[in-house]
């Protein structure tokens, strides 16, 4: 079944039109209960500094959850990293500064949610 699904997805992807537009890399964090406010602040600061350390990053926006809907599943922080294209995102993912950030942040993070999309505008 997995093979059939993989073939179906591959066939669909091959027929899909190539989208153009800025790529948005959305990352949401749920911190461990043991994460201190100081550790969380250090992670916020370090994530924001990636723009000045990785040239392919167009912008980084972030904030904490303020939704009244109570559907956050414990995720408190959201970061949106903008790239010109998928190639730049791929460069970012393997960049030494990104890897250093991940190594620093991971011990305090209980869960992470990542979603990328190509913006229509």
Identify the function of each model-found stretch:
Residues 1-8:
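Bacterial N-terminal signal peptides
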Residues 3, 18, 53, 100-101:
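Generic hydrophobic-segment detector
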Residues 9-76, 84-91, 117-121:
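Short S/T/G/P-rich N-terminal loop/turn motif that feeds into the first structured element of a domain
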Residues 78-120:
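Surface-exposed, polar helix/loop patches in the mature regions of secreted/periplasmic/lumenal proteins
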